[in-house]
Structure formats: structure tokens, C-alpha cells
Swiss-Prot record:
UniProt-recorded name of the protein: Small ribosomal subunit protein uS7
InterPro entries reported for this sequence: Ribosomal_uS7 (IPR000235), Ribosomal_uS7_bac/org-type (IPR005717), Ribosomal_uS7_CS (IPR020606), Ribosomal_uS7_dom (IPR023798), Ribosomal_uS7_dom_sf (IPR036823)
Subunit structure, as described in the record: Part of the 30S ribosomal subunit. Contacts proteins S9 and S11.
Gene coding for it: rpsG
Summary of the function given for this chain in its UniProt record: One of the primary rRNA binding proteins, it binds directly to 16S rRNA where it nucleates assembly of the head domain of the 30S subunit. Is located at the subunit interface close to the decoding center, probably blocks exit of the E-site tRNA.
UniProt cross-references to PANTHER family, sorted A to Z: RIBOSOMAL PROTEIN S7 (PTHR11205)
GO BP terms, alphabetized: translation
Gene Ontology MF: a single term: tRNA binding
Pfam families: Ribosomal_S7
Length: 156
């Protein structure tokens, strides 16, 4: 671990097309091999499809989807006297949002067929409606934390 000062956290600028910080974060998670314009086009196309299907504001639906997929608690492994315990811990807001975006992208990629934009649009709409794999993953994470509540005193 570095002995120098902690790195200064750079502010995330809002996406130029949607004027939204979450959209910028999503583009970064969608991007593969530095192809940012491709990732931006995928997000833009997905938002277009969401707008067509719902008739509402796609950015609002996107924010709702991220909020619904964001975990509040997670379990982390902690070794105590030769045994490894799954210790439930609260998730900071930035980490929770990052996890939600990562899950949304990963589960979109895992969906069947069609273009990435269609898969992403489907996953976002499902998440906004409290359904979909990303929301199921959040519920699973919360259940794990609830089941291991007895080890909460091992928090670090």
C-alpha cells in the first residue's frame, strides 16, 4: 500500500448528451477497450428505446432503475481465529451506486440475443419496475446480510 497521501477524488462531470452524472458513470461501465463513443451510442440507443416503449423520460426511469438496484448492505469475509465469517456491513452511497451500475451492465450482457442497446433497455425497464436480475441480486445480497446478522459485531 502506498505511503503517500491518498489520491484526490476527481469530480464526475455530467454526460454532455443527458446532463446526468449517472449517465457518465454508466458509459464508463459499458465501455470496452477504450471505445467510449460506442458505449455512448449504446446508452443513447437504449434511452431512445425506453422513451419509445414507455413514453416517459428515459433519464428518470434510468435513475429509478439504479436506485432500485442499489444495495444498502453487503457481506464481507473476515477471518477470526481460523474461521471465516461473512460479516454484514453497510454500503457507502458511492459504492452502492457503482455496484448497481456494474450489476445492470453485467446482467444486460448476459441477456439473450439482440443488440446490447436492446438488452440494456430491457434490464433498465425491469429494474425500474422492481424486477430483473440486478434487483434480484440486490435482494440476494440483503438476504445474505440478514442471515449473517449474528456476525455483525465483527465489523471492522
Amino acid at each position: 500500500m502506498s505511503r503517500r497521501n491518498a489520491a484526490v477524488k476527481r469530480p464526475i462531470l455530467p454526460d454532455p448528451q443527458f446532463n446526468n452524472r449517472l449517465a457518465t458513470m454508466m458509459v464508463a461501465r459499458l465501455m470496452k477497450h477504450g471505445k467510449k463513443s460506442t458505449a455512448q451510442r449504446i446508452l443513447s440507443d437504449a434511452f431512445g428505446m425506453i422513451g419509445e416503449r414507455t413514453g416517459g423520460d428515459p433519464v428518470e426511469l434510468f435513475e429509478t432503475a439504479v436506485k432500485n438496484a442499489t444495495p444498502l448492505v453487503e457481506v464481507r469475509a473476515r477471518r477470526v481465529g481460523g474461521a471465516t465469517y461473512q460479516v454484514p456491513m453497510e454500503v457507502r452511497q458511492e459504492r452502492g451506486t457503482a455496484m448497481a451500475l456494474r450489476w445492470l451492465v453485467n446482467f444486460s450482457r448476459a441477456r439473450n440475443g439482440r443488440s446490447m442497446a436492446q438488452k440494456l433497455a430491457g434490464e433498465l425497464m425491469d429494474a425500474a419496475n422492481e424486477a430483473g436480475s440486478a434487483v434480484r441480486k440486490r435482494e440476494e445480497t440483503h438476504k445474505m446480510a440478514e442471515a449473517n446478522k449474528a456476525f455483525a459485531h465483527y465489523r471492522y
